[in-house]
Amino acid sequence: MGEENQPNYTISQENWSLHRKGYDDQQRHQEKVQEAIKNNLPDLVTEESIVMSNGKDVVKIPIRSLDEYKIRYNYDKNKHVGQGNGDSKVGDVVARDGSGGQKQKGPGKGQGAGDAAGEDYYEAEVSILELEQAFFRELELPNLKRKEIDENRIEHVEFNDIRKTGLWGNIDKKRTMISAYKRNAMRGKASFHPIHQEDLKFRTWNEVLKPDSKAVVLAMMDTSGSMGMWEKYMARSFFFWMTRFLRTKYETVDIEFIAHHTEAKVVTEEEFFSKGESGGTICSSVYKKALELIDNKYSPDRYNIYPFHFSDGDNLTSDNARCVKLVEELMKKCNMFGYGEVNQYNRHSTLMSAYKNIKDENFRYYILKQKADVFHAMKSFFREESGEKMA
């Protein structure tokens, strides 16, 4: 073969699966991030970067159970043989290097300077939507009942009827072609053409109306002087996730924000989450305000009513009996009453000691001692009722 006949190209063979390795590793890492988020939800939901965000941004949150990906050199260079349990995947850590012959020092904590290395953690970029999907999956308003309906809400449109006339945009091509084929076949010519006016089929729609039961949540928070920065942060963290949960899963839920010290007043959402106050504590004032709102604005015949009160439990002792009486009065008009107490050091609570005598099954309480308890309080108050679904 002469030089003029030599091909001007070469054929090479390559393992193209290697080109996907970077993509596969990235996908595996994202799966591990999602798994870490799910396993660390109780700690993540109270991250300040999330609670103080506008709820729409992607935020960076620390995930301490996930190492940042990087290339590691094996200084121990020995060959190891081991046996797994059968469910490991590529990239999983199956063992830790135990060399060194002595117990490893942990990272220091508390006061004073230490000589041990700190604990590294991975900062993952997570959208609020991702956290919501993992958090809200098993939550619902308890004891939700069908109430008097003011108006029906259009749920969706169904094309469930066929007619011979209609809008050209709604023509049913398949039925039109079948009709033409049958008519032509009866005349001895099995063909889709020609199509006559009598072959035309149009889809028509009906609006499916879904009656929707209304609900109102009364968010009540103690803003007195005994509620320190940590107590207010915990209460606001709970109400932050509560409002997002309600607005994500329910279309017709009103939320009223009530702040109190010795007096109670209805405030805006912005004031509720940002404004600080001081003074003494008379919790009965907030229950009176809640009853006033129900009587003037939210009839129990038309609304499912859910009051939630958060406090540190430090109430005027002489006011406790009045509080119990008002809570019992509220429960007669409400689907459920929730009381959350922020009590980090397990100190004596005048309010909780009175509420423990309430035996009504619609009264729920939760004592929050650490940040992770915001997650558990949400799970406790909004747990799914397996036997009770709204008809």
Swiss-Prot record:
InterPro entries: Spore_YhbH, UPF0229. This is UPF0229 protein BCG9842_B4751. It comes from the Bacteria. Residues 1-16 have a biased composition (Polar residues). Belongs to the UPF0229 family. Residues 21-31 have a biased composition (Basic and acidic residues). It comes from Bacillus cereus (strain G9842). Residues 1-31, 80-117 are annotated as: Disordered. Pfam families: DUF444 (PF04285). Disulfide bonds: none annotated. Transmembrane segments: none annotated. Residues 98-115 have a biased composition (Gly residues). PANTHER family: UPF0229 PROTEIN YEAH. The lineage of its organism: Bacteria, Bacillati, Bacillota, Bacilli, Bacillales.
